[in-house]
């Protein structure tokens, strides 16, 4: 859609015929309980003021009364579409603070699950965004593929959206015997579906007209609002935590960082589509690198002993009793650990006072920046573009409010 010029905007503001409209907090197009206070003159948006807080759960404060092991079940519900990324951000912070070496097999499995989570999140984004523009076929294709990923998560962890599989020093359990075969089957089918989604959307006249030129977020705005992830890369800045600050051995994987220079909603769509292919490439490399071994550190001051040891080792029983009753005791200090989630830089800042519970947990959310940037980019657009703009930055309100 065409954006109104600054001169025309000034005329509309001086006309005096301005209407205030609340979009949300209960509206299907806001992707959560987000409220936008819009000032309109006719169909033209004069200003946009995002109002957050409707999904505030106090998770950061709640973590202060939970042991480090219990925190995992809380943090993966913040960005509820990227639970593995939340768990990796927190686990990685503790592992850095305590100098814990994660077994190689556990690192590789973590990468597989993180990239599957990224693909699932982008599929949900593509499906819901297309549905808002009455493209139901894309919605059905996307959700059918996402369902297969959720089945894979259920197979390995027993849960579909909140795996809670991460542990400090590794993973709760290893992959079952047929997981890799099912994963390869998914990869083979997904590449065909990706081509179909690309055919349905990339050159679609309606899709292009509705997205191109809408909510342009250039490099200066990205820096001003600290945007990351696909929003940043769609403006032409090639920045990805997996490349800039590698973790879990990402530096040993060959993958590209998709970028585009237009900075509009269509560019963000292209970045996410290309990211899904890069994630598939990373998963295939991880499968090839997967070697037999343990998936949890053998440091008994950090990790519970295997169940089979409890029946024959008094030392294992003592370690389990002390770890459960007294908890984990990280050294006094603080650490910031960030990962590349589906939405951008997700960071956990953990302060330890030496007790079994965090003194403070602060979450750096990518969605918060992307919601705030809407006030900058929606001015001058027509109201029908607001829905497209919200979808294009892909906010998760559980990640915003915390």
From Swiss-Prot:
<comment type="subunit">
    <text>NDH-1 is composed of 14 different subunits. Subunits NuoB, C, D, E, F, and G constitute the peripheral sector of the complex.</text>
</comment>
<keyword id="KW-0830">Ubiquinone</keyword>
<dbReference type="GO" id="GO:0048038">
    <property type="term" value="F:quinone binding"/>
</dbReference>
<keyword id="KW-0997">Cell inner membrane</keyword>
<dbReference type="GO" id="GO:0005886">
    <property type="term" value="C:plasma membrane"/>
</dbReference>
<dbReference type="InterPro" id="IPR022885">
    <property type="entry name" value="NDH1_su_D/H"/>
</dbReference>
<keyword id="KW-0520">NAD</keyword>
<keyword id="KW-1003">Cell membrane</keyword>
<comment type="similarity">
    <text>Belongs to the complex I 49 kDa subunit family.</text>
</comment>
<dbReference type="GO" id="GO:0051287">
    <property type="term" value="F:NAD binding"/>
</dbReference>
<comment type="function">
    <text>NDH-1 shuttles electrons from NADH, via FMN and iron-sulfur (Fe-S) centers, to quinones in the respiratory chain. The immediate electron acceptor for the enzyme in this species is believed to be ubiquinone. Couples the redox reaction to proton translocation (for every two electrons transferred, four hydrogen ions are translocated across the cytoplasmic membrane), and thus conserves the redox energy in a proton gradient.</text>
</comment>
<protein>
    <recommendedName>
        <fullName>NADH-quinone oxidoreductase subunit D</fullName>
        <ecNumber>7.1.1.-</ecNumber>
    </recommendedName>
</protein>
<keyword id="KW-0813">Transport</keyword>
<dbReference type="InterPro" id="IPR029014">
    <property type="entry name" value="NiFe-Hase_large"/>
</dbReference>
<dbReference type="InterPro" id="IPR001135">
    <property type="entry name" value="NADH_Q_OxRdtase_suD"/>
</dbReference>
<keyword id="KW-1278">Translocase</keyword>
<keyword id="KW-0472">Membrane</keyword>
<dbReference type="GO" id="GO:0050136">
    <property type="term" value="F:NADH:ubiquinone reductase (non-electrogenic) activity"/>
</dbReference>
<dbReference type="Pfam" id="PF00346">
    <property type="entry name" value="Complex1_49kDa"/>
</dbReference>
<keyword id="KW-0874">Quinone</keyword>
